[in-house]
Amino acid sequence: MRGMNLQLVCLTLLAFSSWSLCSDSEEDVRALEADLLTNMHTSKISKASPPSWKMTLLNVCSLINNVNSPAEEAGDMHDDDLVGKRKLPLVLDGFSLEAMLTIFQLQKICRSRAFQHWEIIQEDILDNVNDKNEKEEVIKRKIPYILKRQLYENKPRRPYILKRGSYYY
């Protein structure tokens, strides 16, 4: 129960910090989604590590999914069922209403197909990095030192220099 309260506190803090991103109109939500998609597309093209705010967006989505997971484990529910079966406070003040709206908008962003596609791409990038590390470990274990040195260094070997002594003349 304490962990659940901590998650809800984190979500409300996130709601306050991202208030400028979330608004009531559909045009602003679509503009936000378009901005997210363009940033995701550029990070996909560059194949670089994702910026920190995108990783925190992934963490926020997993946090939102963890908050909803006890209700969803009972069975498959649709969005309408989840809204109807949640325990709502008796008195809805402005703060709780705005927090619920922000959480709902974050859920819509996390459940959008484009975001899920981007999340799969990020997992593929992380898997490729892990595969490269595993291949390097295999090379280190199976290949002897000389062959490994020749693989990683492209320098030609220096010929042996024989000392000339009086007996060579």
UniProtKB/Swiss-Prot annotation:
One of its GO terms (biological process) is negative regulation of gene expression. The keyword Signal applies. GO terms for cellular component: extracellular region; transport vesicle. Keywords: Cleavage on pair of basic residues, Cytoplasmic vesicle, Secreted, Signal, Vasoactive. InterPro entries: NeurotensiN. Residues 1-22 form the signal peptide. The record marks P159, Y160, I161 as: Cleavage. GO terms for molecular function: neuropeptide hormone activity; neuropeptide receptor binding. It is found in: Secreted; Cytoplasmic vesicle, Secretory vesicle. Interacts with NTSR1. Interacts with SORT1. Interacts with SORL1. Belongs to the neurotensin family. Neurotensin may play an endocrine or paracrine role in the regulation of fat metabolism. It causes contraction of smooth muscle. This is Neurotensin/neuromedin N. It comes from Mus musculus (Mouse). The gene is Nts.
